[in-house]
Structures are given as C-alpha cells and as structure tokens.
Amino acid sequence: MRFVIQRVNHANVKIDGEVVGNIGHGLLILFGAGQDDTEEMLPKYVDKICKMRIFEDENGKTNLSLADVGGELLIVSQFTLYADCRKGNRPSFTNAGAPDMANALYEKFVAMCRERVPKVETGRFGADMKVSLENDGPFTILIDSEDF
C-alpha cells in the first residue's frame, strides 16, 4: 500500500462538479493498493496515520496528532501511486492492485479510520475526481508498505 498524506487547512473532492467530500483542518490521504497488499496490513497503517505527530503545538513543534487537534480526514483512492516510470515515457500500472481487491482494501481502510476519527470524508473509488486543497506547511509524508 502507498499513502500520500498531506496536512491541510481544508480540502474537498468533486465528482461531476458536485462536492462529495469536504474537510477542514486535518489530513488529505491519497490511498493506493498494490498487487500483494492484504487486509491484515491495514491496522498498522491506520494506527500509524492516526498517531503521527505532525501538527504543531503552541511552540510550533510538530508534536500533536490528528486526535490532539480535532482534525478531519479526506481519503481519496489513487491507483496511480503505483505508476512505474522506469521504462519508456508512458507509466505502467501493472503493480497496482486489481480494482476489486483495491476497492475492498480502500473501503476497509476508510471503515477503520471512521472508528478512530469523528469526521472522515471520501471520494468515490474509480471515479474521475477533482481534488482541491490548501496545504498547511506544506507538510507531506509518503508511507510505502515496501519500506514499512
């Protein structure tokens, strides 16, 4: 699995011009599932993301978690996180998980986040989405299961 995590002041996702997910201060998470990913891997990523101390305290030090700041989550599926650009000029996506499997992992990840975070918004798996955000920092983190 790959996660691109961005600290945001606000973010939203639109499908066909309609806002389907909207958050204030919190995290925008781009979620990608790879061929070898399994549901058993999810708890450690949910725990890591929810506990990461990447929000600033009163001294400007990144010392607070999402829960500490009452932050919100916007989770958007993005298979292109598995783009392989090593050969030629057109990315290959053969390392991305099959749509049915990836969607099941995405939905389970969202459900697990909803157990821990009061406000979790999402895009729609497989849809053409327009994501808007205002980065806070910017502060962006990449988590890759191959490195975890």
From Swiss-Prot:
GO terms for biological process: D-amino acid catabolic process. The keyword tRNA-binding applies. Keywords: Cytoplasm, Hydrolase, RNA-binding, tRNA-binding. GO terms for molecular function: D-tyrosyl-tRNA(Tyr) deacylase activity; Gly-tRNA(Ala) deacylase activity; Ser(Gly)-tRNA(Ala) hydrolase activity; tRNA binding. SUPFAM superfamilies: DTD-like. InterPro entries: Daa-tRNA_deacyls_DTD (IPR003732), DTD-like_sf (IPR023509). Coiled coil: none annotated. It is an enzyme of class 3 (hydrolase). A Gly-cisPro motif from one monomer fits into the active site of the other monomer to allow specific chiral rejection of L-amino acids. Belongs to the DTD family. Homodimer. This is D-aminoacyl-tRNA deacylase. It comes from Lachnospira eligens (strain ATCC 27750 / DSM 3376 / VPI C15-48 / C15-B4).
